Regions:
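Generic structural signal for residues in well-ordered beta-strands
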Residues: 150-152, 270, 302, 356-360
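Short, surface-exposed alpha-helical segments at coil->helix boundaries
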Residues: 135, 139-142, 256, 290, ...
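N-terminal Rossmann-like NAD(P)+-binding domain of SDR-like oxidoreductases, especially those catalyzing
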Residues: 2-278, 321, 325, 385, ...
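NAD(P)-dependent short-chain dehydrogenase/reductase
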Residues: 229-234, 247, 257-329, 345-352
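C-terminal "lid/loop" region of Rossmann-like NAD(P)-dependent oxidoreductases
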Residues: 307-312, 331, 339-346, 353-371, ...
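Non-catalytic, hydrophobic alpha-helical segments
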Residues: 323, 327, 333, 344, ...
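Amphipathic alpha-helical segment in the mid-to-C-terminal domain
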Residues: 247, 285-286, 320, 341, ...
Length: 417
């Protein structure tokens, strides 16, 4: 599927753009009067207060550290060079865009930054390179981006001074906001980090965009986790999202309400996306397919959870290239073909040529949901979105990358890990 370049992001920056149908808008307005939405707003206010109190000293310290890594004439030249579009003169697609990508050294951020650069857009990345998973993988992604002319600033999206400086140096036309604290189970032990990144960080970025001249159009990553305990499948954009099953899901839902408000009050052009279990090369080590691959190759047992009544868990696995092609819209982005976790393991075993040592147990109450299933009809109708990579093909590509990146050879358990 080929998509016109000018359609890949929201229209002219600064214009109000609401993607949902009129009926949906009326439903949202009514929602503000509902008890569930009042709860979400209360959660947001409490979260913002907690974030300020818990992280004030952290922000002061980290801002001083990151400030030492940005600024100066050489740094500004790097920013301008990276942000400059490189489409040929007279291109039918136009002059190109200048895009600020937050979370650029992350899994999805890296792939999106590369795709934007390859089509001739200017790209500047921001990432804090935290230790949620092995930072060396993020640094390797940064090196990959640098080889394609994308400069990634090491900094935190909660640093308003950094964001203001970036918008002062470059009049970005678009912002692709992918920075967030990911993971469902990690939130059980580190709740403050989710409030800090997913709520306070989002607000800091929106404030910077609101004050920028011109105001950039914004695309940001929500999550399929907002559907929470919803038992109606497949999940549709019109389904209820007031039953979060985890703190991560609650922060993403709060983000949707916050962005709606900034669109309503300040006219910011904001488009949100709900990703469904993205996988592929350069992926996140905390994801099941990644950790299964590592443990299978090392001869270690893998833990496979089952739901109530011994029902296998299932996920709507979506290959990264399919996410990239549909990224610039506010729709469910999935594969609409859920696959059970045992089937995922079987496919990995086939491509790794190693039998997994499985340990099957009941799913604990840690915020995970038993299944995800995307209804992509809206994206298909209005965008022409059509995922093309099934799980077997996608995992084959992932395994090829994994074996190469970590230095495995067939039949050997030795690697760089």
């Amino acid at each position: 599927m080929r998509v016109l370049e000018e359609d890949l992001f929201p229209s002219t920056p600064g214009k109000v753009k609401i993607e949902r149908a009129g009926a949906m808008n009326r439903q949202l307005h009514r929602c503000f009067a509902s008890t569930s939405t009042m709860f979400l707003w209360a959660l947001f206010l409490v979260a913002m207060t907690a974030s300020y109190l818990s992280f004030q000293s952290f922000v002061d310290t980290s801002s001083k550290y990151f400030a030492a890594s940005w600024g100066g004439l050489h740094w500004e030249r790097q920013i301008r060079a990276s942000a400059a579009p490189r489409r040929p003169p007279g291109s039918a697609a136009g002059a190109g865009m200048s895009v600020l990508v937050t979370g650029a050294a992350g899994f999805v951020g890296t792939h999106c930054s590369l795709a934007l650069r390859k089509r001739g857009d200017g790209v500047v990345g921001v990432d804090n390179f935290n230790a949620y998973y092995d930072p060396s993988l993020k640094k390797a992604r940064r090196a990959l981006l640098a080889s394609h002319g994308v400069f990634v600033v090491e900094g935190d999206i909660n640093d308003g001074r950094l964001l203001a400086k970036l918008f002062d140096v470059v009049p970005f036309t678009h912002v692709l906001h992918l920075a967030a604290q990911a993971g469902v189970r990690y939130a059980m032990e580190n709740p403050a980090s989710y409030v800090h990144s997913n709520i306070a960080g989002l607000v800091t970025l929106l404030e910077a965009c609101k004050d920028a001249d011109p105001q950039p159009a914004i695309v940001w990553a929500s999550s399929s986790s907002v559907y929470g305990l919803n038992d109606k499948v497949p999940f549709s954009e019109r389904d209820r999202t007031d039953q979060p099953a985890s703190l991560y899901a609650a922060t993403k839902k709060a983000g949707e309400e916050i962005t709606h408000t900034y669109n309503h009050i300040y006219g910011l052009s904001i488009t949100g996306l709900r990703f469904f279990t993205v996988y592929g090369p350069w992926g996140r080590p905390d994801m099941a397919y990644f950790s299964f691959t590592r443990n299978i190759l090392q001869g270690k047992p893998i833990t496979v959870y089952r739901g109530k009544d011994h029902v296998d868990l299932a996920r709507d696995f979506t290959y990264i290239d399919d996410i990239v092609q549909g990224l610039p819209w506010i729709f469910n982005l999935g594969n609409t073909s859920p696959v059970t976790v045992p089937n995922l393991v079987s496919i990995l075993e086939k491509h790794l040529r190693v039998k997994a040592k499985k340990h099957v147990i009941e799913m604990p109450g840690n915020g995970d949901v038993p299944f995800t299933h995307a209804n992509i009809s809206l994206a298909r109708e209005q965008l022409g979105y059509k995922p093309t990579t099934n799980l077997d093909v996608g995992l084959k590509k992932f395994v090829k990358w994994y074996l190469s990146y970590y230095g495995y050879t067939r039949g050997s358990k030795n690697s760089r890990q």
